[in-house]
Structures are given as structure tokens and as C-alpha cells.
């Protein structure tokens, strides 16, 4: 459960990402593909090179989903319900892949936010991304 301080930290960190959210999430996805090659199986016929149009497009989708979660911190299950259905029933993404992506989101944010990505922000973002992952995998039964 996110504390009031966590929510403040998450909103603040996401606001610092700002207009770079699509690019940063594309970079996080690219890092995920490099670090965990099995994640590529969900993206047939993709150009996996850095900055490809497909990675940019998917990065923006991820950024939009994260932004939606940030905007609905008090009711993420409702806000992300359709995405949860999509990933569980249609795409059938292995839940471990959310952990891989979340790790790389943290790495990417740390790389770009530098000193603004404090240990406290890191901890709050980690809790937030774990909560998003839990919501996205909640319909896997």
C-alpha cells in the first residue's frame, strides 16, 4: 500500500519525467529486451534496435499506462482494469515480465533524473511499480 509520502514522491518523480515519458519508457523497454531476451516473444516482427518506431510506439503506450496509474493512485484497479484484461486474457503475458520491465523503468529513471532520483524516490517508485504490476496480473486466475 502506498503511503501519502509515497504518493507525493511518485507524482513528483513522474512530473520530472514530464514530456520525456514516452522516450524513457521506450528506453526501459529496449533495456528489457536486451537484459531479458525472452521478453521479445510477445512482440513478433518487431525491430528491436534502439529508437525503432515500434519501440517508440510501445514506449508511449507504457508511458500512457503509467501516467494513468499516477493519476489514479487511489483506484488503480479500476483505472487499469482494461489493461489488466488485455494482458491476462488476450496477450497472456507471463507476469514475471512486468518485474523485468519495472526494474528497467527504475534504471532508466535513475539514469535520467540523476540526483533527483533519491533513495526515497526510488523506494516509492519501486512500491508504485510493484502495485501496478499487481493490478495488471490480478486477473490471471
From Swiss-Prot:
Boundaries of every Globin domain copy: 1-141
Signal peptide (residue range): none
Pfam families from the UniProt entry: Globin
Modified residues (Phosphothreonine): 8, 108, 134, 137
GO biological process, any: hydrogen peroxide catabolic process
Residues modified as Phosphotyrosine: 24
Record's keyword terms, sorted: Acetylation, Heme, Iron, Metal-binding, Oxygen transport, Phosphoprotein, Transport
Classification via CDD domains: Hb-alpha-like (cd08927)
List of residues that carry N6-succinyllysine: 7, 11, 16, 40
InterPro entries: Globin, Globin-like_sf, Globin/Proto, Hemoglobin_a-typ, Hemoglobin_oxygen_transport
Chain positions with N6-acetyllysine modification: 16
Function: Involved in oxygen transport from the lung to the various peripheral tissues.
Protein residues bound to heme b: 87
SUPFAM superfamilies: Globin-like (SSF46458)
Modified residues (Phosphoserine): 3, 35, 49, 124, 131, 138
Single GO MF descriptor: oxygen binding
Family (UniProt): Belongs to the globin family.
Record: residues binding O2: 58
Subunit structure as annotated in this protein's UniProt entry: Heterotetramer of two alpha chains and two beta chains.
Tissues expressing this chain: Red blood cells.
Protein name: Hemoglobin subunit alpha
Amino acid at each position: 500500500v502506498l503511503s501519502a509520502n509515497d504518493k507525493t514522491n511518485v507524482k513528483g518523480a513522474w512530473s520530472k519525467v514530464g514530456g520525456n515519458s514516452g522516450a524513457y519508457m521506450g528506453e526501459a523497454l529496449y533495456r528489457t529486451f536486451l537484459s531479458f531476451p525472452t521478453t521479445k516473444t510477445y512482440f513478433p516482427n518487431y525491430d528491436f534496435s534502439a529508437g525503432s518506431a515500434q519501440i517508440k510506439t510501445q514506449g508511449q503506450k507504457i508511458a500512457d499506462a503509467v501516467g494513468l496509474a499516477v493519476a489514479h493512485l487511489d483506484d488503480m484497479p479500476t483505472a487499469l482494469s482494461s489493461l489488466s484484461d488485455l494482458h491476462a486474457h488476450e496477450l497472456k503475458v507471463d507476469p514475471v515480465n512486468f518485474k523485468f520491465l519495472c526494474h528497467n523503468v527504475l534504471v532508466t529513471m535513475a539514469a535520467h533524473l540523476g540526483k533527483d532520483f533519491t533513495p526515497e524516490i526510488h523506494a516509492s517508485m519501486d512500491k508504485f511499480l510493484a502495485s501496478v504490476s499487481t493490478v495488471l496480473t490480478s486477473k490471471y486466475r
